[in-house]
């Protein structure tokens, strides 16, 4: 099923019983977080708070609170179908030369479809039905959540940030949290390696001292939102990928104050500039680790204009100790990652990011082991192949007789197939999430690889253990008489 905008998605979810309208007045200060957290843990519906206390704009929460709703947002009917999206991305990331004329013809429709999904720029758009400029700009009109008791200020969480580097043809989309610090000021918390920060850095080099235009779209259609958090190849724009998911070209409109292009169907758009050198301390905030992060300095965005639809919806979320929405997104996008990794490493059978590992900090990989040292090659490949795994601290590699998604299996493999000294790989001074306060230096720390595979000659000189396997005939015999035994 495809959705033209956020409202269409909300309507379809409601028809399926996947959205609940909350008509009781609820405060965006702490109360919405508590309600969304309980609902998410119960695998409950998306929530539309129609009467946020002190505001006229309804708040949409827990939108991607189940893997099934993430799959729906990406145009799939089931989570299992996300593997097909992963296969498409794997092909587009590293397309293989055609093996012959027939193979070339078979691949041609894919490239045609990608080309046909180039974004479409329109002259009029719902996101500009209402325009607020200059002294009338007041971010206080938005029901921005204060999620946790120790949060320093309201925090915009689902802002789709649009930037463009001075040396690039294509725009960058990224989701960065933004602390509200005034009527027209927010802090842009983007890490140094992220696309928005790189674009801004290039701008400062090429246009020193000049204000840098930035736009933040709130409440875009689900395909565009999810396209911004998916490992899209550098050769494909997030807007084009969203078009592939949606089955129709992404409609964009030029901002009223810059040449940046934003989703035409977005509910709310913030337009503004970053003045080089204007920085502010951000935080502390409760984040996806379950802890409050330390205070750090980031650029300030001065909002010069707010445009929005008539009767807009404010899309929001919270981050906290898993499970939270980022963890659920990780579970769903895990299925996209598997084919991409398998394209590079065909020996990979499964790949799993346990949600309790804060979405990406731990990975479990099962492989068809083919030679001594194979597990170490795979763990190094995981760390280096996709930028999404740059911050993965622990990689566990097991044989394919282990279920990567069953901790009973994984722990058994670790405790029976590993020698801590021989089978542990430690790498120091590597990039680490700035939110990871356990690292000795902010943004720099170590990684651990655990080789929990059966050891081959060359890896051990001892006779290796032989796993116990039940006798099949006995199992069948007991299956036949089980009900007669009266044990259950």
Swiss-Prot record:
Source organism superkingdom: Bacteria
Example GO biological process: ubiquinone biosynthetic process
Role of this protein: Catalyzes the decarboxylation of 3-octaprenyl-4-hydroxy benzoate to 2-octaprenylphenol, an intermediate step in ubiquinone biosynthesis.
Keywords: Cell membrane, Decarboxylase, Flavoprotein, FMN, Lyase, Manganese, Membrane, Metal-binding, Ubiquinone biosynthesis
Enzyme class: lyase
Organism: Pseudomonas syringae pv. syringae (strain B728a)
GO cellular component terms attached to this protein's record: cytosol; plasma membrane
Record flagged with keyword Zinc-finger: no
Segments crossing the lipid bilayer: none
Record: active site: 287
Name this polypeptide is given: 3-octaprenyl-4-hydroxybenzoate carboxy-lyase
Entry-linked Gene3D superfamilies: Single helix bin (1.20.5.570), UbiD C-terminal domain-like (3.40.1670.10)
The protein's annotated pathway: Cofactor biosynthesis; ubiquinone biosynthesis
Membrane topology, record value: Peripheral membrane protein
Cofactor note: Binds 1 prenylated FMN per subunit.
Localization, UniProt: Cell membrane
High-level lineage: Bacteria, Pseudomonadati, Pseudomonadota, Gammaproteobacteria, Pseudomonadales
Residue sites binding Mn(2+) per the record: 172, 238
Major localization class: membrane
Keyword Disulfide bond recorded: no
Swiss-Prot/TrEMBL cofactor(s): prenylated FMN; Mn(2+)
């Amino acid at each position: 099923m495809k959705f033209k905008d956020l409202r269409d998605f909300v309507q379809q979810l409601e028809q399926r019983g996947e959205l609940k309208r909350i008509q009781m007045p609820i405060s965006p200060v702490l109360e919405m977080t508590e309600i969304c957290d309980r609902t998410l843990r119960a695998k409950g519906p998306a929530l539309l708070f129609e009467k946020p206390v002190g505001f006229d704009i309804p708040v949409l929460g827990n939108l991607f609170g189940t893997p099934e709703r993430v799959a729906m947002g990406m145009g799939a009917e089931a989570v299992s179908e996300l593997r097909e999206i992963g296969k498409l991305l794997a092909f587009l990331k590293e397309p293989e030369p055609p093996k012959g004329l027939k193979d070339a013809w078979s691949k041609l429709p894919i490239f045609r479809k990608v080309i046909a999904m180039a974004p479409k720029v329109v002259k009029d758009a719902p996101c500009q039905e209402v325009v607020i400029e200059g002294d009338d700009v007041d971010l206080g009109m938005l029901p921005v959540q204060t999620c946790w008791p120790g949060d320093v200020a309201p925090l915009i969480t689902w802002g789709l940030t649009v930037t463009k580097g001075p040396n690039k043809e294509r725009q960058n989309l990224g989701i960065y949290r933004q602390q509200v610090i005034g009527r027209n000021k927010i802090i842009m918390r983007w890490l140094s390696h992220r696309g928005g920060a790189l674009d801004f850095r290039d701008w400062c080099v090429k246009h020193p001292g000049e204000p840098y235009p930035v736009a933040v779209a709130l409440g875009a259609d689900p395909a565009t939102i999810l396209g911004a958090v998916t490992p899209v190849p550098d050769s494909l724009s997030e807007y084009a990928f969203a078009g592939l998911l949606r089955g129709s070209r992404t409609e964009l409109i030029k901002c009223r104050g810059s040449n940046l292009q934003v989703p035409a169907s977005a509910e709310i758009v913030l337009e503004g500039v970053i003045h080089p050198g204007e920085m502010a301390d951000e935080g502390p905030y409760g984040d996806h680790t379950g802890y409050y992060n330390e205070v750090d300095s980031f650029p300030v965005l001065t909002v010069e204009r707010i445009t929005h639809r008539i009767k807009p919806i404010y899309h929001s979320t919270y981050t906290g100790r898993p499970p939270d929405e980022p963890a659920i997104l990780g579970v769903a996008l895990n299925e996209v990652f598997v084919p991409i990794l398998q394209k590079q490493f065909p020996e990979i059978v499964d790949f799993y990011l346990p949600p309790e590992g804060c979405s990406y900090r731990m990975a479990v990989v099962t492989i068809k082991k083919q030679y001594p040292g194979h597990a170490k090659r795979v763990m190094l490949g995981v760390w280096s192949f996709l930028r999404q795994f740059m911050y993965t601290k622990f990689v566990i590699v097991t044989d394919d007789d282990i279920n990567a998604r069953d901790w009973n299996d994984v722990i058994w493999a670790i405790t029976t197939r590993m020698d801590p000294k021989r089978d542990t790989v430690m790498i120091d001074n590597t990039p680490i999430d700035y939110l990871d306060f356990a690292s000795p230096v902010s943004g720099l720390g170590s990684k651990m690889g655990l080789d929990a595979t059966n050891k081959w000659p060359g890896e051990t000189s001892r006779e290796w253990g032989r796993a116990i396997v039940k006798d099949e005939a006995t199992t069948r015999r007991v299956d036949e008489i089980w009900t007669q035994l009266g044990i259950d």
